[in-house]
């Protein structure tokens, strides 16, 4: 059975997306993760944005973009929100893992506003395909700006 990861696309008004760097990896990602028992997709996406970026988002501003095939064993349910541009240095990840040397490390260790044109190069292949081929980031932003 496929699992589903719930994520949020964090847009500013300047056609950039806030991406998070996965600690120990070479790629950038969006805040996302599995839903806790009894949690809706929107609740999981909001929680992941809070845990991985330190951002408390308005649940009423969240736009459900739908579910996308992400990997053979996992789907990706995406939400989008337009936020005031935050200083990436103020973002803080509050979820941790133990690395192979026994050190406690944050899941995300850096944050960056990324122009849409650079998303494909920064993200892992499957995420890049969802964000640049299955979605139009420009169209999503246009809808958010129009209040749809």
What spans do the regions from the language model cover?
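A generic structural signal for short hydrophobic patches within well-formed alpha-helices
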Residues: 35, 119-120
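Active-site-adjacent beta-strand/loop module that shapes the phosphate/pyrophosphate-binding cleft
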Residues: 68-100, 112-117, 130-142
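N-terminal strand-loop-strand
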Residues: 1-30, 79
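Functional cleft and adjacent loop/helix regions within the main domain
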Residues: 26-27, 31, 37, 78-81, ...
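A generic fold-level signal
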Residues: 1-3, 12, 71-73, 106-108
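The catalytic Nudix box helix
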Residues: 30-64
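Membrane-topology and secretion signals of cell-surface/extracellular proteins
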Residues: 29, 41, 55, 76, ...
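Short, charged/polar surface micro-motifs in flexible loops or helix N-caps
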Residues: 14-17, 24-26, 36, 72-73, ...
């Amino acid at each position: 059975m496929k699992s589903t990861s719930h994520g949020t696309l964090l847009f500013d008004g300047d056609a950039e997306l806030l991406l998070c760097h996965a600690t120990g990896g070479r790629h950038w990602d969006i805040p996302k993760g599995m839903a806790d028992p009894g949690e809706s997709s929107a609740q999981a996406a909001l929680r992941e944005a809070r845990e991985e970026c330190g951002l408390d988002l308005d649940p009423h501003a969240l736009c459900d973009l739908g579910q996308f095939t992400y990997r053979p064993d996992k789907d990706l349910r995406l939400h989008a929100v337009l936020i005031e541009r935050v200083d990436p240095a103020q973002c803080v990840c509050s979820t941790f893992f133990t690395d192979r040397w026994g050190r406690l490390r944050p899941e995300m260790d850096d944050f960056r506003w990324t122009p849409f044109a650079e998303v494909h190069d920064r993200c892992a292949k499957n995420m890049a395909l969802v964000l640049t081929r299955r979605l139009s980031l420009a169209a999503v932003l246009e809808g958010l700006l129009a209040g749809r």
